[in-house]
Amino acid sequence: MDIIFGRNRKEQLEPVRAKVTGKIPAWLQGTLLRNGPGMHTVGESRYNHWFDGLALLHSFTIRDGEVYYRSKYLRSDTYNTNIEANRIVVSEFGTMAYPDPCKNIFSKAFSYLSHTIPDFTDNCLINIMKCGEDFYATSETNYIRKINPQTLETLEKVDYRKYVAVNLATSHPHYDEAGNVLNMGTSIVEKGKTKYVIFKIPATVPEGKKQGKSPWKHTEVFCSIPSRSLLSPSYYHSFGVTENYVIFLEQPFRLDILKMATAYIRRMSWASCLAFHREEKTYIHIIDQRTRQPVQTKFYTDAMVVFHHVNAYEEDGCIVFDVIAYEDNSLYQLFYLANLNQDFKENSRLTSVPTLRRFAVPLHVDKNAEVGTNLIKVASTTATALKEEDGQVYCQPEFLYEGLELPRVNYAHNGKQYRYVFATGVQWSPIPTKIIKYDILTKSSLKWREDDCWPAEPLFVPAPGAKDEDDGVILSAIVSTDPQKLPFLLILDAKSFTELARASVDVDMHMDLHGLFITDMDWDTKKQAASEEQRDRASDCHGAPLT
């Protein structure tokens, strides 16, 4: 499967015009900006894990029925250092880099010492975050990189630690209606404590504060949750929010800090420091956004691994939240390149299929309720929350759908009651082969699939003046295992799930992870002018397929 995984992708620095078939809605004007691993070998050295690859940004600019594509590697410090050395010298999740073997013993000793408390990579390959008027490539370390979403140029590096004490942070923040960013990170053994930190980055400098300063300087800690283990905090990829609450799952998929601190000496990767403890519980933390305090009742469920929260909302004194959950951590194991490139079908079988699960958590627990009582009275779900003798509440989910990943919703309904989940379809392999629209109300689904095609995360873009939750389009970047089939941007009608258009590009496109759509309303006059220049340049791009 080297045609998809493991092969380095070429940049498309100049915009190329796509061949459009079908009709793109006239109202769809903007840029789909995506991120994912694109380079897996540097010189003679090779990354071990697909999530280690150097970040490759790419974009589809849609304007007046035409589509323009471009891609560029994120010029992170990691990228520049590796390219200059012509080998991998910066460690990643599944690949530990080592000193030049020609160095003397003192240089080697210093390198070991410096890796005891690692300075993580700035290879931000997972997602794109909007903060105020700026856009950032993100991963799960303390570093993010500001980018120019028009040219894909890499700008300054931002270290979260300058503004909030976190060593790790999610690449799936939430945004309120004012554009403020709410995110979570882990503070490892800070002043003798390990904790999960919820923090807010304002979209603009708050009123009354000195203007001209960066909004980052006004980042504030929203709430801190002590880790149940000082040296083994939970790994998490995302979290949930409602209008008034934050939902955090402290799952028994944990990072061993002592192993991480000695990984370099033991010649092991950081990935080896993660372990799933199936005999333990998953603790559900609920934080009130108004008081900034955790709800005191202790909620838990069975051991599981969650990478993606789907959505959450409040209903009849309960919090209802939906997640994609696994019974184990086999997903990460399958993305080792050795599994993806040799005997693919045999080596890429999950031992747990991802399922869409709905949980319900009561905000107020009746102290007089008998032990074993189901505290959930919401008619819309069969999820239960059972009161236990010690006052804890055991939550059991409703299983909604099997075989979903990379979920997205209409973001206007984020934190609110909603009906539709848009996701990729997977089964025993982690590789998506279809796009699915799941209707939570009717428990029905619609699907798009095409032979030899692997779709990326489907992103919903609402139509102007939309009245229904599914009024809009779905955008997904499609790559193919058939070398004769060009990659393309797929545009689906979100309501009927019929294909409206596709924009094929004769480029070396990679399989990406996450991203966002920037509407033309998000561009200022200067950016609009730059877009016109891009169109003029694309028309003269040699070798570009034209409509």
UniProtKB/Swiss-Prot annotation:
Keyword Oxidoreductase: yes
Lineage: superkingdom: Eukaryota
Cofactor annotation: Fe(2+)
EC number, UniProt record: 1.13.11.63
Keyword Chloroplast: no
EC category name: oxidoreductase
UniProt name for this protein: Beta,beta-carotene 15,15'-dioxygenase
Name of the gene encoding the protein in the UniProt record: BCO1
